[in-house]
Structures are given as structure tokens and as C-alpha cells.
Amino acid sequence: MSTETLELIKNSIKSVPDYPKAGIMFRDVTSLMEDPKAYQATIQLLVEKYKQGGFTKIVGTEARGFLFGAPLALELGVGFVPVRKPGKLPRPTIAQTYDLEYGTDTLEIHTDAIVEGDKVLVVDDLLATGGTIEATVKLIRQLGGDVQHAAFVINLPEIGGETRLEGLGLNVYSICEFPGH
């Protein structure tokens, strides 16, 4: 990726201090999508990275993972599978609960969305602790999917999510990094 492209993408991501709580610097990818050149460059970088990967499904996590995973799936000519909060998917699902900083959360996937042997790429907007993606990977593997790659627009390396996901056997790719939380 060229320095110019990286700067275009990085500069389009607005940083919002003290959101959602004091001491957090929120990295807002919705501002990236407001800039069609930056959004297109982001999707094209992902396409170039994964076009030879042989994936059969792209899985995106609620909600911002949909915004990058679905266009990537279209470009690669493969199916897109959403992983959502409980009660949002109409067909039979399986669920995975995971720990948050203060409490727990749960994700669900349709039981027929992944079939044995599907080669899956997981996509989300931001990697922090890795908890959401770990839960997503567990769901995919429970359904027989082969998931070895996870892609992000942003990585916050100081939080340690990349190390956590590598511990699950994932190859982790992020377009850009930001310091802090």
C-alpha cells in the first residue's frame, strides 16, 4: 500500500475524545465512509490482500464489520454472513457469550450460514481486545468453518487483541494502527 493511500485512509478517520466514556479516544470509521475515495481505497486494499485467498464466505461482525465485509464479499464474488446481537437473526442460530470490560455480551450466527469446509475470512472495523472476534471464530468453527484470517481497518495494538487472536491461530491484518484506547 502506498504511503499516500494509507494517509488518505488514516486522515479520514476522525478521533473523538472521551467517547463513549472519559479517557477513551474513539476512532470513528463512519467518517471514512463519508469520503468515497477513502472508503473505496479501503475496500480495494482488502480486495488486493485477499483476492487469491480462496475464501468461500466473508463474515462481518455487528455492526461496522458489515460496512467493510459486505462490499469485500461482493468484490470477491463470495457470500457474506452477518454475526449479530441476540434476537436479530430470523432463522435458527447458535450463540457465543464473551466477556466485556464490565460484563458479558453475546453474538449469534445462523446455523446454516456456514457449512463444513467453508474457508472464512472475518472482517471488522477495529481490533481492540479481540473478544468479539474470538467469539465469532468460535461460532464459525462450531459450524465446521475453516477460519484462519481476520482483517481490520484499524488496530489498537496497545490493547493486545492481535496477540489474543494470533493465539487462536489467526493471521491478523490491519490497514492502519492508532495509539491508545
From Swiss-Prot:
<dbReference type="InterPro" id="IPR029057">
    <property type="entry name" value="PRTase-like"/>
</dbReference>
<dbReference type="GO" id="GO:0003999">
    <property type="term" value="F:adenine phosphoribosyltransferase activity"/>
</dbReference>
<dbReference type="Pfam" id="PF00156">
    <property type="entry name" value="Pribosyltran"/>
</dbReference>
<keyword id="KW-0808">Transferase</keyword>
<comment type="pathway">
    <text>Purine metabolism; AMP biosynthesis via salvage pathway; AMP from adenine: step 1/1.</text>
</comment>
<protein>
    <recommendedName>
        <fullName>Adenine phosphoribosyltransferase</fullName>
        <ecNumber>2.4.2.7</ecNumber>
    </recommendedName>
</protein>
<keyword id="KW-0328">Glycosyltransferase</keyword>
<dbReference type="GO" id="GO:0006168">
    <property type="term" value="P:adenine salvage"/>
</dbReference>
<dbReference type="InterPro" id="IPR050054">
    <property type="entry name" value="UPRTase/APRTase"/>
</dbReference>
<comment type="function">
    <text>Catalyzes a salvage reaction resulting in the formation of AMP, that is energically less costly than de novo synthesis.</text>
</comment>
<dbReference type="InterPro" id="IPR000836">
    <property type="entry name" value="PRibTrfase_dom"/>
</dbReference>
<comment type="subunit">
    <text>Homodimer.</text>
</comment>
<dbReference type="GO" id="GO:0044209">
    <property type="term" value="P:AMP salvage"/>
</dbReference>
<dbReference type="GO" id="GO:0002055">
    <property type="term" value="F:adenine binding"/>
</dbReference>
<dbReference type="GO" id="GO:0006166">
    <property type="term" value="P:purine ribonucleoside salvage"/>
</dbReference>
<dbReference type="GO" id="GO:0005737">
    <property type="term" value="C:cytoplasm"/>
</dbReference>
<dbReference type="InterPro" id="IPR005764">
    <property type="entry name" value="Ade_phspho_trans"/>
</dbReference>
<dbReference type="GO" id="GO:0016208">
    <property type="term" value="F:AMP binding"/>
</dbReference>
<comment type="similarity">
    <text>Belongs to the purine/pyrimidine phosphoribosyltransferase family.</text>
</comment>
<keyword id="KW-0963">Cytoplasm</keyword>
<keyword id="KW-0660">Purine salvage</keyword>
